Amino acid sequence: MKMIVGLGNIEKKYEGTRHNVGFMVVERFVEEHGGNFNKEKFDSLISELFINGEKIIVIKPTTYMNESGRAVRPLMDYFNLTTEDIIICHDDMDLEIGHLRLRQKGSAGGHNGIKSIISHVGTEKFKRVRVGIDHPQKMSVVDWVLSRFTKEQEAKLDDGLTRAVAALDDWIENDDFMNTMNRFN
């Protein structure tokens, strides 16, 4: 069993914002696998999928971004998962829009959702799919991550979301994250 977590803010006003890229990844992943987020447990919307005979739990925390760990830890405990079994999809300002960077571990890098997960699971050693949202040019970081993409940026983002879903599929199919990293980084 594996768990895929998409980070974002659940309120309608945040849909389509840069900070919700993690939600966009898991929403597309679930849609492409014919599922939906039809369960709610431990401050999360949940989709349970079976891919190649393996149960895949996909979650969107309903906490605010900065409290994501409060949703992730109880679900890990409930499903008896370790950090080896989970992957977190989130936005990254240090990458150009739509670019991917897969990592096996690392610091929060200023991302408060990741910081919360590290705090609640007690380690930095969990997989991540980081999707670029670019750096703010002339606005504050808060205003930037809560802003929406331009039409031109949406096309680049769409390519990134497609590649992120392909990376998740690769990880599930081959169960070898190092090879997935080599293919998608």
From Swiss-Prot:
Which GO molecular function terms does the record list? peptidyl-tRNA hydrolase activity; tRNA binding
EC category name: hydrolase
Q: Where is this site: Stabilizes the basic form of H active site to accept a proton?
A: D91
Q: Which coarse location class applies to the principal site listed for this UniProt protein? A: cytoplasm
* A Pfam family per the record: Pept_tRNA_hydro
| An example Gene Ontology CC term for this record | cytoplasm
From the UniProt record, list the reaction(s) this protein catalyses.
an N-acyl-L-alpha-aminoacyl-tRNA + H2O = an N-acyl-L-amino acid + a tRNA + H(+)
EC numbers on record: 3.1.1.29
Q: Which GO terms describe its biological process?
A: protein quality control for misfolded or incompletely synthesized proteins; rescue of stalled ribosome
Which keywords does UniProt give here?
Answer: Cytoplasm, Hydrolase, RNA-binding, tRNA-binding
| Protein's cellular compartments | Cytoplasm
Q: Which domain of life is it from?
A: Bacteria
Which positions in this protein are listed as binding tRNA? Y14, Y64, N66, N112
Q: Where is this site: Discriminates between blocked and unblocked aminoacyl-tRNA?
A: N9
Enumerate the active-site residues: H19
Which InterPro entries does its entry note?
A: Pept_tRNA_hydro (IPR001328), Pept_tRNA_hydro_CS (IPR018171), Pept_tRNA_hydro_sf (IPR036416)
What exactly does this protein do? Hydrolyzes ribosome-free peptidyl-tRNAs (with 1 or more amino acids incorporated), which drop off the ribosome during protein synthesis, or as a result of ribosome stalling. Catalyzes the release of premature peptidyl moieties from peptidyl-tRNA molecules trapped in stalled 50S ribosomal subunits, and thus maintains levels of free tRNAs and 50S ribosomes.
Family note: Belongs to the PTH family.
Quaternary structure and partners: Monomer.
Q: What is this protein called?
A: Peptidyl-tRNA hydrolase
Gene name? pth
